[in-house]
Regions:
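Structural recognition of alpha->loop->beta junctions
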Residues: 47-61, 102-110, 166-173, 276-278
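Catalytic beta/alpha-barrel core
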Residues: 15, 31-40, 44, 53-67, ...
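Domain-level signature for soluble enzymes in the chorismate/prephenate branch of the shikimate pathway
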Residues: 211-308
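Active-site mouth loops of central-metabolism enzymes
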Residues: 8-14, 32-38, 58-59, 88-90, ...
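Short, acidic/polar
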Residues: 39-46, 159-164
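Catalytic alpha/beta core domains of metabolic enzymes, predominantly
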Residues: 67-198, 207, 213-216
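Glycine-rich, proline-tolerant flexible connector loops at the mouths of alpha/beta enzymes
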Residues: 1-18, 180-190, 246-257
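Alpha-helix-loop-beta-strand connector modules within alpha/beta enzyme cores
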Residues: 11-36, 71-81, 131-146, 192-211, ...
Length: 308
């Protein structure tokens, strides 16, 4: 990017407007499309004046509705494609809201970039992929093309290939990979940069699988999954009925709704199913956290009946 919003001051924040002239040379001498990140209305005006073909909104900017609205207003009446990175925090509604602001301003050529989400204490990835969030975005915004930024997700060049393949396996429409002729000398994000030769190798190893699964074999499996899901829903409804009955007993006996010891024992009991690797322990915890949260909500409703 010509401009680079950084987490802390003092880091390289881009060359600025001067770099637009470099992009103009690339476009005129090599015939390539050029793009840059924009974070303010001034950036938009300068980029458009320089003939930049595509703009993108960075993660930190997406997280600020005021900044997105300012950019949307600056783009009103302009036919230029705009890509929007997910916000740094895992909030699908905030991401969708950025698209709504742009669309309402008349920007119709829109695309999404998944670059991962900040997570306190994250060690392996620079930004946790949390694939379920871009999947939910696509479920709700199916017409929006989505590309993946494995460089920012991984934060390490050795993760770019595997993350790129995961994105393609999830039917992403493309990739945004950072490359540098000499990554050691890169002024920012040097650890995640790959050389052009390395990029060529990565691209040669990627496999694009067919998204067409409309055949009899898949229909059979999906019918089986539907039957299992129906049973799961029936059991969840029964479980919540029992939770409400427990709430009534707790109300009668003056007991607190949340019982930490009981919850911890439940988690311990079911994580034993994870030992053979057939299901991830974090997935089990996540499932039971969601079920327990709804059980607590149901019990609180019973305990507080008549107190609203």
């Amino acid at each position: 990017g010509v401009w680079k919003p950084r987490t802390r001051p003092g880091c390289f924040e881009g060359v600025g407007q001067e770099a637009l002239r470099w992009l103009q040379r690339v476009k005129s001498e090599l015939g390539m499309y050029v793009s840059t990140e924009v974070a303010t209305a001034v950036h938009v005006e300068q980029a458009l004046a320089a003939g930049i073909d595509l703009l993108w909104i960075g993660a930190r900017t997406t997280a600020n509705p005021f900044a997105v609205q300012e950019i949307a207003d600056a783009l009103r009446g302009v036919d230029v494609p705009v890509l929007v990175k997910n916000p740094v925090n895992p909030d699908v509604d905030l991401w969708i809201g950025a698209f709504e602001r742009l669309y309402n301003a008349g920007v119709k050529r829109l695309g999404a970039i998944h670059r991962g989400f900040s997570a306190y204490g994250e060690k392996f990835y620079r930004n946790a992929p949390q694939w379920q969030l871009p999947i939910e975005f696509r479920r709700r915004m199916g017409d929006i093309a989505m590309i993946c930024d494995p460089s920012h997700i991984g934060g390490k060049r050795e993760l770019v290939l595997s993350l790129s393949q995961q994105a393609l396996d999830l039917n992403f429409d493309g990739l945004m990979i950072e490359t540098h002729c000499n990554p050691v000398c890169a002024l920012s994000d040097a650890r995640q940069q790959v050389t052009p030769d390395e990029l060529e190798i990565i691209m040669s190893k990627l496999v694009r699988r067919s998204a067409d699964s409309a055949n009899a074999d898949f229909r059979s499996y999906r019918n089986s999954l539907d039957e299992i899901d129906d049973k799961l829903m029936e059991l969840l409804v029964k479980r919540m009925a029992v939770a409400r009955e427990i709430g009534a007993v707790k109300r009668e006996k003056g007991l607190t709704v949340f019982q930490p010891f009981r919850y911890n024992k439940t988690i311990e009991r079911y994580t034993k199913y994870c030992k053979d690797g057939k299901i991830d322990i974090e997935a089990v915890k996540s499932i039971f956290e969601a079920v327990h949260s709804e059980s607590i909500r149901q019990q609180l409703r019973v305990v507080n009946e008549g107190n609203e």
